[in-house]
């Protein structure tokens, strides 16, 4: 089995193997020959840089299918269980639906999300899947840190004061 981030089912692609593991491989897309009708251009200006939204290149129904399939595969392949995962009930609005917001603060004081598979912070002002209130809170904390010269936590040194976490919103998620 080869895991290829950002590939969409049904596509014909050229890929490069980037990592070989015991029972699988990881790869990256080199060229897409036949894009899936379920592939779309992400509206997010941070897509491809930020690791916070791995499915924004998919239509929303395909995103729900991919998430369900990921759980089904993990239960079957890793867990050895023969269970059927039910269909995912999607959000009423596929934007600003995330009910847990966690914004890391970079050593330079930038606030955003980690770049995929790294702990490098990609500065972000507005996220399409976080609540607008969470975005405003993150920006306010960033301004507060700059104003009062509050140091960000640096995981390499273990020093610093701030790693931002915004709790869930109480509003109905549908």
Predicted regions and their residues:
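Accessory RNA-recognition modules of RNA-modification enzymes
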Residues: 1-167
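Single conserved hydrophobic/aromatic residue that forms the stacking wall/gate
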Residues: 168-174
